[in-house]
């Protein structure tokens, strides 16, 4: 019997309404066993709503922290929720 690991893909996003939905769909298509976290880095468009509508977990940051800040927020989420692997 194999041990199943909890895997999370972290996707930082800032004003990506034009692409975030497709990216989340692609991850779910190719890696159906993983969860997707979109870190909405203070976007002013529909990034958050579109990511959520495609099945992603969305972490909304109140303002733009940049790629480093968004990734740190994602890693903190991984740690707090107890995921085994993050991508």
State where each predicted segment sits:
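Structured catalytic core of nucleotide-sugar glycosyltransferases
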Residues: 1-87
